[in-house]
């Protein structure tokens, strides 16, 4: 029975240690290979604690400074503490599935996408699927592509884990020489279960052993690889899948890799680390999963997704990061997370929800995916939240995710003309209300927020920027306003009255603005130049990449001011408000 002993409380993260019959073993290592373990004999729990203190002092002395962030602790440890593991599942934007990824391997695309993942999010790890079809039909090319992929990851300080088998989605019809196209509206419609049903011989599962072992063997002591995952979401009522999970784990462990070998679901006999999935925003269940087996630790290899109408949030990135930070703040164990299902909003079509019918219009905000195919963030607020958590280095001038919004006031905000903020998790405004934050001397910046109209009326809601002299009246301020109703996007100037500047017809977009649906609104103000983006979609439906309005205000432009949110003749909700210097605009 493993016993967990927490490291002394400090302002940096120390890996917890595990005690078993007088030995300390660092977590996230291969417990089946004594030759690769760092084992120190101790005589008691007290001496273990003393050893931990000594090691803390030694590490600090060796480093010459305190470890200031999870990212630094991650880099300093070849078997990192799980709180430094923040990433996403990865298939390049061009690929419909993992078979196409490895067959049509494009290193220049992978390089660009991973560089962006590190730049915008500080990502430290990726979860990457393999397939026996590639191994069986082009073995040398497949293994060479894995090595090249690892080289790219290593250049960007990213450590991937690899998945061998998967019971999800298409069990038939996937062939190396028969490429398939994405189907609009069909979530993961071309994803390849592994193995395909034609290769699932219950009398000969051993034929898959070379696939597992020949991938692991050249990398069994390769610190660029974080873990090996035998089976993603096996059907537990399938005798074949349950048996293959057990066999795959044994095949991997035969090679005594330095990396842990893991497998779904949660804790089981075929995993060295609890392998958890969660797509709900009720974080009490996340807590239970994180603490299922303290001796093993936990990684959420699928950690939530965004809100998709009419359903509630599935654990969007800002919520998950706030949950992690909350656990860390009170000294609780912090698991690793792979956010929002996948890194790229690409041809996997996971921007749509599970089970959406073919032909469904583009969503206003992708359900899954952190980066667009051009390697820019879907949400600057999400990028700020994740990067700040991982690196400890904020870039935002202002950020509010409203995860702890109190009644009836909100620190950093001033309300004008109506009721103040309400429930936690978002900012609700009554009709005829505006709230202002920031500094009147701010000049060039990018402002982004999510906006939801609560009914279809002649009213509108949106963002105010370069705000000066605000008051309680609807138009009482000097500055700019960009707002939307279900038909149009409006940009105008306010000087205690309304001066329209530009409009955009929203009805011509494939994604439609509707009540009770989130919209993603972004404004860049640089000198007199103003640009507005709304509800960017996949490039197949949106060649303008979300840019809806662009103009230069040549008549007495307002060049500085604060920011805020506004509702006019309609109740509206707001979330994930961020302000960044203009140079941070992708």
Label for each model-derived stretch:
Residues 497-520:
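Short, aromatic/His-centered strand-loop micro-motif at the edge of beta-sheets
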Residues 429-495:
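Secretory/extracellular carbohydrate-interaction modules
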Residues 72-273, 277-284, 295, 307-312, ...:
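Active-site mouth of glycoside hydrolases
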Residues 554-586:
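Ligand-recognition surfaces built from glycine- and aromatic
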Residues 517-531:
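Localized edge beta-strand/strand-to-loop motifs within extracellular or lumenal beta-rich domains
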């Amino acid at each position: 029975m493993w016993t967990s002993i927490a490291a002394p409380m400090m302002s940096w993260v120390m890996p917890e240690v595990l005690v078993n019959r007088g030995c300390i073993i660092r977590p996230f290592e291969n417990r089946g290979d004594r030759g690769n373990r760092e084992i120190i004999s101790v005589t008691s729990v007290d001496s273990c604690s003393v050893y931990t203190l000594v090691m803390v002092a030694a590490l600090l002395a060796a480093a010459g400074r305190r470890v200031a962030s999870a990212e630094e602790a991650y880099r300093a440890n070849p078997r990192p503490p799980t709180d430094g593991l923040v990433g996403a599942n990865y298939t390049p934007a061009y690929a419909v599935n993992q078979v196409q990824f490895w067959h049509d391997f494009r290193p220049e695309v992978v390089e660009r996408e991973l560089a962006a993942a590190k730049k915008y999010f500080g990502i430290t790890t990726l979860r990457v699927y393999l397939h026996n079809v590639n191994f069986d039909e082009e073995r040398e090319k497949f293994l060479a592509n894995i090595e090249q992929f690892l080289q790219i990851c290593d250049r960007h300080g990213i450590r991937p884990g690899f998945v061998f088998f998967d019971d999800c989605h298409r069990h038939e019809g996937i062939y190396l020489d028969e490429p398939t196209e994405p189907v609009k509206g069909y979530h993961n419609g071309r994803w390849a279960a592994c193995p395909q049903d034609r290769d699932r011989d219950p009398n000969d599962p051993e034929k898959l052993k070379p696939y597992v072992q020949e991938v692991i063997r050249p990398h069994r002591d390769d610190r660029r690889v974080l873990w090996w995952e035998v089976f993603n979401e096996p059907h537990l009522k399938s005798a074949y899948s349950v048996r293959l999970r057990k066999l795959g784990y044994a095949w991997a462990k035969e090679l005594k890799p330095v990396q842990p070998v893991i497998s779904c679901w949660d804790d089981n006999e075929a995993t060295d680390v609890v392998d958890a999935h969660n797509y709900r925003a009720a974080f009490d269940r996340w807590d239970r999963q994180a603490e299922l087996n303290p001796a093993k630790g936990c990684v959420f290899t699928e950690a939530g997704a965004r809100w998709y109408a009419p359903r509630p949030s599935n654990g969007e990135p800002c919520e998950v990061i706030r949950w992690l930070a909350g656990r860390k703040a009170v000294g609780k164990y912090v698991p690793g997370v792979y956010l929002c299902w996948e890194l790229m909003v690409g041809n996997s079509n996971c921007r749509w929800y599970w089970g959406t019918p073919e032909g469904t219009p583009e969503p206003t905000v992708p359900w899954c995916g952190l980066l667009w195919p051009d390697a820019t963030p879907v949400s600057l607020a999400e990028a700020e939240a994740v990067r700040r958590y991982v690196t400890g280095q904020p870039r935002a001038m202002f950020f509010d995710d409203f995860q702890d919004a109190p009644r009836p006031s909100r620190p950093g905000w001033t309300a004008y003309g109506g009721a103040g903020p309400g429930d936690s998790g978002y900012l609700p405004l009554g009709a005829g209300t505006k709230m202002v934050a920031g500094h009147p001397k701010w000049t060039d910046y990018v402002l982004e927020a999510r906006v939801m109209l609560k009914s279809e009326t002649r009213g509108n809601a949106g963002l105010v920027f370069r705000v000066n002299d605000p008051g309680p009246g609807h138009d009482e301020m000097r500055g700019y306003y960009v707002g939307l109703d279900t038909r149009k996007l409006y940009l105008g100037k306010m000087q205690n009255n309304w001066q329209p500047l530009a409009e955009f017809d929203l009805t011509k977009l494939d994604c439609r603005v509707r009540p009770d649906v989130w919209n993603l609104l972004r404004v860049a103000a640089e000198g007199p130049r103003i640009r507005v983006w709304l509800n960017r979609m996949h490039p197949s439906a949106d060649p303008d990449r979300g840019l809806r309005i662009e103009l230069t205000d040549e008549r007495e432009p307002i060049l500085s001011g604060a920011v805020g949110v506004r509702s006019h003749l309609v109740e509206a909700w707001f979330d994930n408000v961020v302000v960044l210097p203009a140079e941070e605009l992708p």
